[in-house]
Amino acid sequence: MKIGVFDSGVGGLSVLKSLYEARLFDEIIYYGDTARVPYGVKDKDTIIKFCLEALDFFEQFQIDMLIIACNTASAYALDALRAKAHFPVYGVIDAGVEATIKALHDKNKEILVIATKATIKSEEYQKRLLSQGYTNINALATGLFVPMVEEGIFEGDFLQSAMEYYFKNITTPDALILACTHFPLLGRSLSKYFGDKTKLIHSGDAIVEFLKERENIDLKNHKAKLHFYASSDVESLKNTAKIWLNLLRK
């Protein structure tokens, strides 16, 4: 099976890594719209337009499935993509919510959703969790994390200052939903900041389990072939994959 993975930039590499390590697919084509990142500050119509253009890009590869590894795109463009695509299209929000439900059986536990401004504004996570009976949900736009990841800043004083700024009035949550696929790249730093009490919900791990339960996919005895594309500076994208995620070998 050949699948496509789409993200606004390099953040979706966190989802790609989980899909790659799960050995569910024969070939994975990753496309990052790095020329127009971030999506989280753009309006709905623009996000849909960019996502439909990405869908057109994937048509040349004859993929069997498309994973939208971008929470903002999943929040605003999933219906439009499904209406146009001739193959299954999955977003990461349903998977993230499902993973949270599995992780937190006590619905009075505290949940913190961090994401781009657009994803928080969509209230997709908040509405879905409230509908499942969760009562203690905070949502916080932490958009500065996106360009930091794009620039390869995964730890250090600058990130520490940003976390202290964003989380200064936040009590330690029981679950932290990383509702932007850039944010798992900051996972080690976020775990260190909040401590062992906080369970991190990772879009990549969540989508793997989500797909296993919904698609008839056999485990492969080989790892998938990877192909990387970007709307600008594909070498930088490949470098991030190689250095941080260890996806590419020299």
UniProtKB/Swiss-Prot annotation:
The lineage of its organism: Bacteria, Pseudomonadati, Campylobacterota, Epsilonproteobacteria, Campylobacterales. It is an enzyme of class 5 (isomerase). GO terms for biological process: cell wall organization; peptidoglycan biosynthetic process; regulation of cell shape. This is Glutamate racemase. Belongs to the aspartate/glutamate racemases family. The keyword Cell wall biogenesis/degradation applies. The active site is at 70 (proton donor/acceptor), 180 (proton donor/acceptor). SUPFAM superfamilies: Aspartate/glutamate racemase. HAMAP family: Glu_racemase (MF_00258). It comes from the Bacteria. Pfam families: Asp_Glu_race. It catalyses: L-glutamate = D-glutamate. One of its GO terms (molecular function) is glutamate racemase activity. Keywords: Cell shape, Cell wall biogenesis/degradation, Isomerase, Peptidoglycan synthesis. Coiled coil: none annotated. PANTHER family: GLUTAMATE RACEMASE. Its EC number is 5.1.1.3. Provides the (R)-glutamate required for cell wall biosynthesis. Substrate binds at residues 7-8, 39-40, 71-72, 181-182. Pathway: Cell wall biogenesis; peptidoglycan biosynthesis. The keyword Secreted does not apply.
